[in-house]
Every structure is written in structure tokens, then in C-alpha cells.
């Protein structure tokens, strides 16, 4: 299976929604503590085990997250440690990039998510405790959502409703927002420890998953959020990212500081259906391809990016 | 939370992801029963020792014991009280761990270096039977002394076990000993047989006629055809180790096991002056010491130990006995300390016992590597170091995050598996100890002991994070401090009682071989051994070494210094009217404070055309200091001082040392502690100068 060795530590990996063989990877020097960052755009060679880098962009600070535009196949957006948000167009020559840079967040930007239904806007979340809404055609952010009391590690659009999103924070709450409303519409105290990630179910717009420092992944139904639908135990350390499958209703992928990537079916009793131990350092980035069923990607502090088919060994080539 | 810098904020944020996770460890819900311990008269909260009265009638509570065995001194392993001798200990190991790796070497028979190849406990056992039988074959009798005159390698331990199994007395000789010392030891102990290597064989042959007791020389690592043949009539046989093995195998004898009270070994210590002294240790002495230590620090069959400290030293010897008890695999270094790091990388030991000199080198190597690693890496290291240090000081479990980020790479330098570091033989500076604890993330413990006590007198307890002391008494002995009025050390001293460290218990040696007079000097009628070290009791019953009773001290590299002798040499210098030589175990060189002769100084300055306003100014002139030191050096060479006995820097003072300024005794001897305090600033300045002119090596 394809493996890419980056010069820096991996932080995030995302499949292109337009090309099944294209990925973007966010990386940072010195574990993202101090130093530069780099964004890699990778191409999987069809039918061969190789990965080639088509382009890369250097940044002055760590890149913590990256996402692809849903409207332009060559555009991607990066969340940078210095509080900036940068937009790149891979169709343009490198000197023209980044095509935009927004310096609004006061602290590290930890996540970026493109609106999949309206396809004209995106969200960023930051350690300055805010979430910001941006439109591609505006020179500054459209709106700032400031309610969380600590770092917001992730903000994700609802897959069906173009105005609804969820945010996961170190203040131990998950919040649901509607951009038409003045404040959050729902506050779920989902974990007793910091919440590091969240994602919406792609088949049921009321179901969410959260992951936390408490080593668990929890699945929630916003219609009855007093108790979780499921609590998934199995990681040995904080769970850094959680992601719902775009193809199977009850399948969840997660990655953790315990260096493993896990696959869960939250509907069945023995929920842990797969565990991958291919990373040798913290596993912090994961994605599942929308275009190819079962194709997964992960990255971590071991500077490696793996792409593999579910059920196979990521290390087997 | 506010942080000084973004990188600190990032580190803290990620660290909190890892460290604040709920723990799966249920043991935290178990608490010690506080009532039980406070109800006992022996125990105090947070104490490592218990205090008992020395004599019931006088009622003075001044004897300290380990709280781990307050009512009875340990003399046998608590789990295996049937082990009374080194032979029993090895038999126990062979029965329990027969198939386990025991002795490993990476030196191949052709002298090249490769991977470690191992001998199991079972194989070592049959080899030691053959060696013992071979010695009997050559007429060595039970109770005879057998010398070991070569550096650490598997055969050393096999021979030592053979001695234990057949009741020979092993007499180790440092491979660095010169011909005169070897000659003395061989004759003094009346050695019948001696094991050597080709290099040390040549030394032996150079004075063969002067060591008539020797009947058998066994050459380890030498081929028979290359061995010299001796003229008939010398009565000495030279055989190779291999030949002795095969001779033994063809005439195997049953063991003749020793009794616990039998002599196991005679260890010759160099001493400060005069001839070596033979420390007589019984099997019971050694077993007691190791059994006591094992109560606090256990070795396991999964452990790998690196052997590089001389086996002739009691510290390494005791560790080996402990290793056998635990079924440890012992890998030997290739024989070159400068390649030790390479051996570490291949062996990947879990236990590392060493001396401050090597730890200081590791410290210097890492700090200078960090300094030259660039701003970013240096900054990361500093943040990680300080955070982990704070966690340890505050009694919290330090974050695994710092290890992952910074320290695991450093740990890899020692193979990555070290879980226990021991330090002994001279004091480890607290800075270096903290540094080792932080960088290697393992238990780092300092011990204190001497050959006369079969090794450990006291050692740091597990989980004691205070550095700068040598811990609580070995459960196999009791310790008291005796007033030394002439040096102003008493049990009434505030804040902590002070005095000469005295030790009693089953670990105390039988005496110096054939030297009752010296034995009586150190061992009193009540069985107390007077160490000559001055200690104080820190809170919690932990011992701290602060001085030597005699005016003798050790330098960092372990050399003993008798300052009066050196002062007498230097006062012959024309500029010097009085001289105070200072040195301590944290520095490897001596410095001098010299009270100058004003007349000589004036005349000399006039002849050199040096202008000055007052004598003090002249004393501070670097040209003057240089000239005086050069003349002192000349006198030192004339008097044949050894290299480390030379003062490496000098401070000149215009005023004399007198009774009035408190620097002299009524008999006109220098009051050393007072002089040290009086000139503290000048002394530290001189060491700074020495350090500045000798940059530390940048590589390990």
C-alpha cells in the first residue's frame, strides 16, 4: 500500500472530493511545537504502490489542518499555527500561492472544514476559543462564534443542513450551531475531559461522534443527548480524531495518541472491528475517501502518510 | 492559562491531552494504613530510617537502621534464607535459571568485535566445575589463595565461582597494578595459583623468581603453543585456560562447599600511603550485604547488566552477586572504555552501575550536544527539561510526552532500556543526578560503602527524589555518628547531628589480612567499624557525607589527596610563607591559597620593574600569580608529586594565616573547614578559571 515519507511530522490528511487519487497533507516541524510547516499534495499512482508529490507549499509556522474546496477542484485551505488561514490554488504556479491569507485568529488554528452543501463557505476553529465562518468571496471572516471557554479543536459542517455545524472544545462541551441564530443552539457536556474531535454521521443528520482525552469515542443523537448512543472503549490514550464513514452508516474511524487507528461499528456489541498499529508515533490525522469505498489514509508524528484499503495491512506493499 | 511563549503553550496543550487521561491503574485507591505505622514506636512519617538506643542502660538513641528491617539486621535473602555462601547463591541461580543467558562477550576468539555471544547459567556451572577440578588436579588445596589478574571477561566470574565451589580464596588484582604492588599482594596472600592474560603474564614473568608461592599460572585467552616454557626446576606450571578446562573435565571432582564463616575473598585496597591492605571478607559478609541491598533494589531474569567497572573493586563484585541472585544476563564491555557507548548500543542493558566520573562525562556530552544542536532544539530541550524537573520536584508523575519529544532520543544513547542507574565510589553532584533522572527517566540511586563493609553501607531509597545524600542504612547494618570534637562535629550540632560514621553488622569484614594493628585502628571492641568519613543525618534518617576525619580527601577521579604533604612541598617556594591546598570530590584538580612572603615579593617586583601601590594589588597581578605557580610547579616536580597532586591554580593573599583570624590551631596547623569557608570565593573563582581554560569534550 502507498506510503509517503514527509520531512516533518504529520498532522492531517484529506482525500480530494474530485479526484480519487489525490490527497493533501498538513505537516509541521518539531511536532508542531516550534518551526515551519509544509502542505503536500500527493498523487496515488494508479495500480502501483507508489505515491508522488505533485506540489508542496512551505509555511512559516506549523500546518495543523487542511481541507479541499468543494467547488474548485484545485483549491485547498490550510489552518496555520500562527493564527492565519491560507488558501492555495494548485492550478496556479507556486509563486502565486497562497492566493489568500487571513490573519484573524489570535492563536493557533486547529481545524478547517469546507461547507459540503452550500459550497461557498468554510469554518475554522482555533485555540483562541472561537470558530470563524468565512466566504470565499469576502476579504474578512463573515462571523465569529465565541462561546467556548477553551481551545476549539474542531468545527464540522452538518452534511445535510448548510447552516448547521458542530464544534468540539477543550472546555469539555460539544456545541451545535445554526449560523442563522445568534448563539449556539445546543450545548452537550459530552465528556468529563477535553473533547478533541467531532464528526457528523453521513446518513443520519442528527447523529454525531466525539473523541476525547478520556480515551473514548462517544456517539450522540442530538434529539436525545442526555446519554450517548454508544461509548467506544479501546484506545489507550486520548483519541485525537474521529471520522464517520461516507459509505457505511455505522462505521467510524479514529486515531489516537496510543499510535493506533481503530475502526468501529457503533451499532454492534463488539464495536471495535479493526485496529491498525502501523504508526510508530502519535497518530493524529485520518480520512476516508468519498470516491473509493474502503480507502483510508492516516498520518502521524512518525512523518509517514499511509493510504490503504480497509481490511488490508497498511504496511504491506 | 498564560504561557511565556507559543511553544510552551503548545507543549502544555498537547501534554495535557496525554497526561490528564483517566487512569486505568486501580492501585491508587490503595492507601497505606496510617494507623498501623503511627502506632509503632519505630516509625515516623516520611522516614527512611528508624532510630534505636545503642545501649539499653545509657538510653541514648543514636543508632540508625533501615525502616525495612528495624528489629533484626538482614543477613540472608528474605526469600531464600538457605543461601549462606556465594556457592549456594550460584547453585540457586543454576537451579532456577539454568537455560537463561548469563555471561556474554562480544570479543571473538580472534580478537575481533561482533555481536554478543552468551553462556547460560548451566554452561557456566559446568565450566566452573571443570576449572575447580583443574585447580585440584594441579595441587591447589582447599583454603589456598587464587589470584585473578585480568580485566572483566566471562572467565573472571567462572573462576570466581570455581573458587567458591571448591573453597579456594579468590584474590582479585587490578589489571592496572604495577609490578611492585602485584609482587607484594602475591607474597602477602601466599597465592598458589594466578589467572592472567597474555599482557599481565609478561609482568608476572618479569619477577617470577620473587614470587615463590606461585605454582600454577593460568593464561586466559592465550593458546598453549604460544605460551613460554619455563626452565625445569622453577616449580611453576603455565597452562592455558582451555587446557585447564580439559584437564578438569577429565578428572571432575565433587564440590567442597565453603561454610558461611569461611573466607571468600581477600580484596587488596590501595590505601593512601604505604602498602596495600588485604580486606578479608567471608561468604556470610558478602551474602549479608547483597541480601540487605536486595530488599530495596531487586534485579530480575529479564535484566541485562553491563560489566565494565573493575571486578577487583567491591562495588562491581557485589553487583555481580546481586545479578546471580536475580538471574541477570551480564554482558561485558569490549575492554576499552572509549568504546563503551558502542557496547551500550549493542547490548542495550537495563541496569547500569557506574561512578560519577562516567556520569559526569555523559552529562558533559549531552549538555554540549544540546548547546550545539541549534536554537530550536535547545529551546525544546530546555522547556522539556524544566517541565519534567518541576513535575519530579512536586512529586507528580512526569509526562510521557517530554520523553517522547526529547528524552527518548537521549535514552537511546545508552541502548534505550536502562531502568536502573547506580552510582557509587565517590559522590555524585546533585545537578548531575537530577540531570540523569530527567534525561534517562529511570531510577537513579546513589550508594555509599567501602570494601571493609562488603560494599553498601547506605543507599538511596526507591522514590526518594532528594539528591545530595547517600540514603538510609543498608538493612544489613546499623549506623551511628560519633562526635569528633577536634573537628567540631557533634551529635548536638544544629540543624543536623554530625560525626564520624560508624557501622556495625554482619557485613563488617574480619580484619586486614595479617595486620592486627591496622584492624584494631578501624574496628573497635564493640564491633563498630570507624569509616573515617564525617556524615550528618538529614531529616528522614538519610545520611549525607560532608568530610573526612583525617585530612585526606578524594578528588573527582577518585584519587586520594593528603594535603599537608603537598603544602609542605609548596612552602619551600621562596614566595610562599604559608599554603593551603584545597580539593574535593566534585573537582578533579587541586587549588592553592598562598600567603606570600612580602619581602621576597617586593624584591622580585623591583627586579622585574613592576609598579604597584600596595601588596594586595601585586598579589592580584596575573603575571605575579603565573610566576609563583610556575615556581611551585618546579618544586612539585622536584619532590616528585603525582600529576593530580599539583595545584592547578593559585590565589595569593597578602595577610598571613594566624590564630587571630581563626585560620590556625594553637599548634599552628591550618584549620581546614574554616580556611575553606574563609576563602570560598577565591576557591570557586579558581575552579571557574580552570574550567574556562579546559573546555569540556563535546562528545561522549
Curated annotation (Swiss-Prot), chain A:
From the Swiss-Prot or TrEMBL record, state where the protein is found: Cytoplasm, Cytosol; Peroxisome matrix
Expression tissues: Expressed in siliques and leaves, but barely detectable in flowers, stems and roots.
- What are the record keywords, sorted? Cytoplasm, Peroxisome, Peroxisome biogenesis, Protein transport, Receptor, Repeat, Transport, WD repeat
Its domain of life?
Answer: Eukaryota
SUPFAM superfamilies in the cross-refs: WD40 repeat-like
- The residues bearing each WD repeat, given as ranges, are 58-98, 104-144, 147-187, 190-230, 234-274, 278-317
Question: What happens in the null mutant?
Answer: No visible phenotype, but reduced sensitivity to indole-3-butyric acid (IBA) and inefficient peroxisomal import of PTS2-containing proteins.
Biological process, per Gene Ontology: protein import into peroxisome matrix; protein targeting to peroxisome
> Mind telling me which Pfam families this protein's record contains?
Beta-prop_EIPR1, WD40
**InterPro entries with a match to the protein in the record:** G-protein_beta_WD-40_rep, PEX7, WD40/YVTN_repeat-like_dom_sf, WD40_repeat_CS, WD40_repeat_dom_sf, WD40_rpt
Q: Name one GO cellular component term.
A: peroxisomal matrix
* The protein's role, per its UniProt record: Receptor required for the peroxisomal import of proteins containing a C-terminal PTS2-type peroxisomal targeting signal. Specifically binds to cargo proteins containing a PTS2 peroxisomal targeting signal in the cytosol. Cargo protein-binding triggers interaction with PEX5 and formation of a ternary complex composed of PEX5 and PEX7 along with PTS2-containing cargo proteins, which is tranlocated into peroxisomes by passing through the PEX13-PEX14 docking complex.
The entry sums up its family as follows: Belongs to the WD repeat peroxin-7 family.
State any further remark: The binding of a cargo to PEX7 is necessary but not sufficient for the targeting of the complex to the peroxisome. PEX12, PEX13 and PEX14 play a critical role in this targeting. PEX7 is required for PEX5 stability in light-grown seedlings.
PANTHER family the UniProt entry points to:
PEROXISOMAL TARGETING SIGNAL 2 RECEPTOR
Name the chain's protein.
Peroxisome biogenesis protein 7
Which species is listed as the source? Arabidopsis thaliana
The protein's gene is named PEX7
Swiss-Prot record, chain B:
Which reaction equations make up its catalytic activity? a long-chain fatty acid + ATP + CoA = a long-chain fatty acyl-CoA + AMP + diphosphate; decanoate + ATP + CoA = decanoyl-CoA + AMP + diphosphate; dodecanoate + ATP + CoA = dodecanoyl-CoA + AMP + diphosphate; tetradecanoate + ATP + CoA = tetradecanoyl-CoA + AMP + diphosphate
Q: Where, per UniProt, does this protein localize?
A: Peroxisome
Instruction: Note the SS bond partners.
Output: none
Q: What class of enzyme is it?
A: ligase
Gene3D superfamilies hit by this protein: N-terminal domain of ligase-like
Spell out the subunit comment. Interacts with PEX5.
Query: Can you say what this protein is called?
Result: Long chain acyl-CoA synthetase 7, peroxisomal
Source species of the chain: Arabidopsis thaliana (Mouse-ear cress)
- Organismal lineage: Eukaryota, Viridiplantae, Streptophyta, Embryophyta, Tracheophyta
Amino acid at each position: 500500500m502507498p506510503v509517503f515519507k514527509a520531512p516533518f511530522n504529520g498532522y492531517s490528511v484529506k482525500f480530494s472530493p474530485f479526484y480519487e487519487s489525490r490527497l493533501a497533507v498538513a505537516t509541521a516541524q518539531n511536532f508542531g511545537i516550534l518551526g515551519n510547516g509544509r502542505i503536500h499534495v500527493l498523487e496515488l499512482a494508479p495500480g502501483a504502490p507508489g505515491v508522488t508529490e505533485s506540489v508542496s507549499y512551505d509555511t512559516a509556522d506549523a500546518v495543523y489542518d487542511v481541507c479541499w474546496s468543494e467547488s474548485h477542484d484545485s483549491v485547498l485551505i490550510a489552518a496555520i499555527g500562527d493564527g492565519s488561514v491560507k488558501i492555495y490554488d494548485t492550478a496556479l504556479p507556486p509563486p502565486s500561492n497562497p492566493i489568500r491569507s487571513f490573519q484573524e485568529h489570535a492563536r493557533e488554528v486547529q481545524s478547517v472544514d469546507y461547507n459540503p452543501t452550500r459550497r461557498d463557505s468554510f469554518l475554522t476553529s482555533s485555540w483562541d476559543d472561537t470558530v470563524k465562518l468565512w466566504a470565499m468571496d469576502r476579504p474578512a471572516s463573515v462571523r465569529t462564534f465565541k462561546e467556548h471557554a477553551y481551545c476549539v479543536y474542531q468545527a464540522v459542517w452538518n452534511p445535510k443542513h448548510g447552516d448547521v455545524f458542530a464544534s468540539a472544545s477543550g472546555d469539555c462541551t460539544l456545541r451545535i450551531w445554526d449560523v442563522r441564530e445568534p448563539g449556539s443552539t445546543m450545548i452537550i457536556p459530552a465528556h468529563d475531559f477535553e473533547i478533541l474531535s467531532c464528526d457528523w454521521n453521513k446518513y443520519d443528520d442528527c447523529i454525531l461522534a466525539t473523541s476525547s482525552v478520556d480515551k473514548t469515542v462517544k456517539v450522540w443523537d442530538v434529539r436525545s443527548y442526555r446519554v450517548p448512543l454508544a461509548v467506544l472503549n479501546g484506545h489507550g490514550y486520548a483519541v485525537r480524531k474521529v471520522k464517520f464513514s461516507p459509505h457505511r452508516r455505522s462505521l467510524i474511524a479514529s486515531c489516537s495518541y496510543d499510535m493506533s487507528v481503530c475502526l468501529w461499528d457503533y451499532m454492534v456489541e463488539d464495536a471495535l472491528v479493526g485496529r491498525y498499529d502501523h504508526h510508530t508515533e502519535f497518530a493524529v490525522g485520518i480520512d476516508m475517501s468519498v470516491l473509493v469505498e474502503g480507502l483510508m489514509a492516516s498520518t502521524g508524528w512518525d512523518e509517514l502518510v499511509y493510504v490503504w484499503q480497509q481490511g488490508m495491512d497498511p504496511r504491506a506493499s | 492559562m498564560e504561557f511565556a511563549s507559543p511553544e510552551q503553550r503548545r507543549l502544555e496543550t498537547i501534554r495535557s491531552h496525554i497526561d490528564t487521561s483517566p487512569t486505568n491503574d486501580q492501585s491508587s485507591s490503595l492507601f497505606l494504613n496510617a494507623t498501623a505505622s503511627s502506632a509503632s514506636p519505630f516509625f515516623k512519617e516520611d522516614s527512611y530510617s528508624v532510630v534505636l538506643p545503642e545501649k539499653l542502660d545509657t538510653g541514648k538513641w543514636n543508632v540508625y537502621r533501615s525502616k525495612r528491617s528495624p528489629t533484626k539486621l538482614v543477613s540472608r535473602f528474605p526469600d531464600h534464607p538457605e543461601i549462606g555462601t556465594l556457592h549456594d547463591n550460584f547453585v540457586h541461580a543454576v537451579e532456577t535459571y539454568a537455560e537463561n543467558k548469563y555471561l556474554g562477550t562480544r570479543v571473538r576468539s580472534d580478537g575481533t568485535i561482533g555481536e554478543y555471544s552468551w553462556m547460560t547459567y548451566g554452561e557456566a556451572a559446568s565450566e566452573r566445575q571443570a576449572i575447580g577440578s583443574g585447580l585440584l588436579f594441579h595441587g591447589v588445596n582447599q583454603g589456598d589463595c587464587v589470584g585473578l589478574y585480568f580485566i572483566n571477561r566471562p572467565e573472571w566470574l567462572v573462576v570466581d565461582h570455581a573458587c567458591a565451589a571448591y573453597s579456594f580464596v579468590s584474590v582479585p588484582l587490578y589489571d592496572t597494578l604495577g609490578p611492585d604492588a602485584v609482587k607484594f599482594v602475591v607474597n602477602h596472600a601466599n597465592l598458589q595459583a594466578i589467572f592472567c592474560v597474555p599482557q599481565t603474564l609478561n609482568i608476572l614473568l618479569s619477577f617470577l623468581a620473587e614470587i615463590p608461592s606461585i605454582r600454577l599460572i593460568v593464561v586466559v585467552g592465550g593458546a598453549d603453543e604460544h605460551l613460554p616454557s619455563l626452565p625445569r626446576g622453577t616449580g611453576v606450571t603455565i597452562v592455558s585456560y582451555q587446557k585447564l578446562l580439559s584437564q578438569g573435565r577429565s578428572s571432575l571432582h565433587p564440590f567442597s562447599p565453603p561454610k558461611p564463616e569461611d573466607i571468600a575473598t581477600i580484596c587488596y585496597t590501595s590505601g593512601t600511603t604505604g602498602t596495600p591492605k588485604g580486606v578479608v571478607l567471608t561468604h556470610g559478609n558478602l551474602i549479608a550485604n547483597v541480601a540487605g541491598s536486595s530488599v530495596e533494589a531487586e534485579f530480575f531474569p529479564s535484566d541485562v547488566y553491563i560489566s565494565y567497572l573493575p571486578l577487583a573493586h567491591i562495588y562491581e563484585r557485589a553487583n555481580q552477586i546481586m545479578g546471580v541472585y536475580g538471574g541477570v544476563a551480564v554482558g561485558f564491555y569490549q575492554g576499552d572504555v572509549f568504546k563503551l557507548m558502542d557496547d551500550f548500543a549493542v547490548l542495550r542493558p537495563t541496569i547500569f552501575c557506574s561512578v560519577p566520573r562516567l556520569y559526569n562525562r555523559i552529562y558533559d556530552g549531552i549538555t554540549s550536544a544540546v548547546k550545539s544542536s541549534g536554537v530550536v532544539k535547545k529551546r525544546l530541550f530546555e522547556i522539556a527539561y524544566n517541565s519534567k524537573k518541576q513535575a519530579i520536584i512536586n512529586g507528580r508523575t512526569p509526562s510521557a510526552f517530554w520523553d517522547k519529544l526529547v528524552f527518548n532520543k537521549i535514552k537511546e544513547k545508552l541502548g534505550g532500556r536502562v531502568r536502573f542507574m547506580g552510582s557509587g565510589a565517590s559522590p555524585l553532584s546533585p545537578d548531575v543526578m537530577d540531570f540523569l533522572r530527567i534525561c534517562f527517566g529511570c531510577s537513579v540511586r546513589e550508594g555509599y560503602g567501602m570494601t571493609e563493609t562488603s560494599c553498601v553501607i547506605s543507599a538511596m531509597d526507591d522514590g526518594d527524589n532528594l539528591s545530595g545524600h547517600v540514603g538510609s542504612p543498608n538493612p544489613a547494618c546499623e549506623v551511628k555518628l560519633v562526635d569528633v570534637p577536634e573537628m567540631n562535629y557533634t551529635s548536638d550540632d544544629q540543624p543536623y547531628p554530625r560525626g564520624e560514621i560508624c557501622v556495625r553488622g554482619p557485613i563488617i569484614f574480619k580484619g586486614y589480612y595479617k595486620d592486627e594493628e591496622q584492624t584494631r585502628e578501624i574496628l573497635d571492641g564493640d564491633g563498630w567499624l570507624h569509616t573515617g568519613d564525617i556524615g550528618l543525618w538529614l531529616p528522614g534518617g538519610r545520611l549525607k557525607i560532608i568530610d573526612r576525619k583525617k585530612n585526606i580527601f578524594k578528588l573527582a577521579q577518585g584519587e586520594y589527596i593528603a594535603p599537608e604533604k603537598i603544602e609542605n612541598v609548596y612552602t619551600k617556594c621562596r614566595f610562599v610563607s604559608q599554603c593551603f591546598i584545597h580539593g574535593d570530590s566534585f573537582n578533579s584538580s587541586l587549588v592553592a591559597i598562598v600567603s606570600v612572603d612580602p619581602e621576597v615579593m617586593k624584591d622580585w617586583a623591583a627586579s622585574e620593574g613592576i609598579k604597584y601601590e600596595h601588596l594586595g594589588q601585586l598579589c592580584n597581578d596575573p603575571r605575579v600569580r603565573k610566576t609563583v605557580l610556575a615556581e611551585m610547579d618546579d618544586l612539585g616536580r622536584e619532590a616528585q608529586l603525582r600529576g593530580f597532586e599539583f595545584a592547578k591554580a593559585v590565589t595569593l593573599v597578602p595577610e598571613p594565616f594566624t590564630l587571630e583570624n581563626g585560620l590556625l590551631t594553637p599548634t599552628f596547623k591550618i584549620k581546614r573547614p574554616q580556611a575553606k569557608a574563609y576563602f570560598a570565593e577565591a576557591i570557586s573563582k579558581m575552579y571557574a578559571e580552570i574550567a574556562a581554560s579546559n573546555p569540556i569534550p563535546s562528545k561522549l
